Amino acid sequence: MPNHLKRPIHCTFATAMKQFNVPIIYRSPLIAAVKNKRRQEDKMKKDFSPTLLDFGPLQLYLARHFGFCYGVENAIEIAFRTIDENPGKRIFLLSEMIHNPQVNADLQDRGVQFLQDTYGKQLIPFESLSKNDVVIIPAFGTTLAIEEKLRAIGIPIQRYDTTCPFVEKVWNRSEQIAKKNYTVIVHGKPTHEETRATFSRAAKAAPAVIVNDMAEAVVLGEYITGENKVDDFYSRFAGKYSNGFEVEKDLQQVGVVNQTTMLASDTQDIADFFKQVMIKKYGLDESTVDKHFADTRDTLCYATNDNQSAVYGLLETEADFAIVVGGYNSSNTSHLVELCEERLPTYFINDEDKIISPDEILHYDLHQKLEKQTKGFLPLKQPVKILITSGASCPDALVEGVINKLAGYFNAAIKTGAFIKKFS
C-alpha cells in the first residue's frame, strides 16, 4: 500500500465556530445542510466516513470535511469588507488572495489589482504606490522584506492583513524554537507564498533551510551524519538556506515546521526522520532527544489535517472514480488529488463547466501541468459511484454545481431539494 494511505494523522484541534460574512455566491444550501447535520452528529470530529447522496442510478459520496477553512473565510471577509469601506481608493492585493480562480476573478471585477503573481513576479512596481493606497496581504502572509517596503511607503499593513492565524501559529513556533538555538527546517514548496513568508521569519530568528519532500530531507540528514560533503550543501540547497548558514554548526539542533497546506503525514514523517537522525548521531533516547530535536507537531493546521483525514475516510468507499474540485495552483487541493490518485481514477477540475458532457471531462493533470480531455469518464453501468471532495480555498457553491451537473445526466437533479430537507 502506498505510504500516504498507510497512516492518516489523527489530532484533536480546538477551533472557534465563528460565522464569517462571506458573499452568498460562494455558499451552497445543499452543502451547508450536509455539513451542519454532520457537525451536529459528530461534534468531536471522530467520524471521517463520507456522506452519501443517493440519486438512485447515481451515488455521490461527499468527504466528511472539505471546502473553505477558517483562514480562507477570514481572508475573504476582510477583502470584501475592505472594498466596501474604501470607495474611490486604489486597492491592491500583494498576490492572489487564495488559490481559487473564481474568488480572485471576483475581487478583480471589484477593481482589486494584484501587485505580484503567485511566484513573486512583480506585476505592478511598489514604486507606483502611495500612502493613500490600500494593500491587502493575502491569507498566505508575506515576507518581512515586502512588509518593510510597504511600511516605507506609509501603507498600514496591519489593517488589511488577512494572514491565516494558523500560518501565524507556525511563525510563532519558529520563533520559539529559534530562541532555544534550534535551526528551523521548513517543509514546503520553496516558491509558494506561504513558504517564502515562513522562511523569511524563521531566517530572521535563526538559521533556516527549506526541504520540499522526504527525498530532500534524507539528503539534508546525510549532511547531519557527515555522509555528504559540507561544501556540496550550498549547491544542493541553493536558494533554500538562510544567509550565513554553517552546515556543521547549524545542523546540530533542529526543529521542523511546515507550509500548512502540505500533507500532514509527510510533515510528520519528515519530523520523525530528523528525530531518528539525531537519536542515532548523538546516542540519544526518547527522554533526551529534545537536546537536539524540537517537537513541533502542534503546528499542523487543523483544516489541512481534517480535509486529508476525510479523504482517507472517503477512500474506504469503493467507487468508480473521484472528482476533486479546486484551483489548479492550490497546494492543499493538489495533495488531496494525489491521495485519491493512489487509489482510483481521479479528475481534478476547477468548476462544473469542465464536465462538458456525459461522455467528456476536461481535467488538470498534476504531473504534466496541463488540462487533459478524457472521453467516456462515466461508466456504462448503474449505479455510478463517485467520490467528491474539494480544497480549502474552493467555494461550496462550486461543489454543488458539480453535483447538479452530474445529477442532471441521470435525470436526478430534482432530488437536490429533497436532500436539503433531509439534512436540515
Can you name each region flagged by the protein language model?
Residues 5-424:
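The feature marks the mature, well-folded catalytic cores of soluble enzymes
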